[in-house]
Amino acid sequence: MPRSLKKGPFVDDHLLKKVDVQNDKNTKQVIKTWSRRSTIIPDFIGHTFAVHDGRKHVPVFVTEAMVGHKLGEFAPTRTFKGHIKDDRKSKRR
């Protein structure tokens, strides 16, 4: 179930402050964050966030198409190595 419209999108306060400071200074430095739950708002467009995936920080450049999504959607937490296509050693037994 989506969030109520009267509440508005959730954004961590510390993240919003960092973006506002960079917008005031007209700088575009990478913002390191652990807040995967924050919703991307139009103020974030053009900024790069380093979103933590549990192991390292993944750089995410925010575009217009990302508005309304969560930061964590763009930093996958699981690595898929792929299925083994053909294992000849186990078939010989």
Swiss-Prot record:
One of its GO terms (biological process) is ribosomal small subunit assembly. Keywords: Ribonucleoprotein, Ribosomal protein, RNA-binding, rRNA-binding. GO terms for cellular component: cytoplasm; small ribosomal subunit. GO terms for molecular function: rRNA binding; structural constituent of ribosome. Pfam families: Ribosomal_S19. The keyword Ribonucleoprotein applies. InterPro entries: Ribosomal_uS19 (IPR002222), Ribosomal_uS19_bac-type (IPR005732), Ribosomal_uS19_CS (IPR020934), Ribosomal_uS19_SF (IPR023575). PANTHER family: RIBOSOMAL PROTEIN S19P FAMILY MEMBER (PTHR11880), SMALL RIBOSOMAL SUBUNIT PROTEIN US19M (PTHR11880:SF8). HAMAP family: Ribosomal_uS19. Belongs to the universal ribosomal protein uS19 family. Protein S19 forms a complex with S13 that binds strongly to the 16S ribosomal RNA. This is Small ribosomal subunit protein uS19.
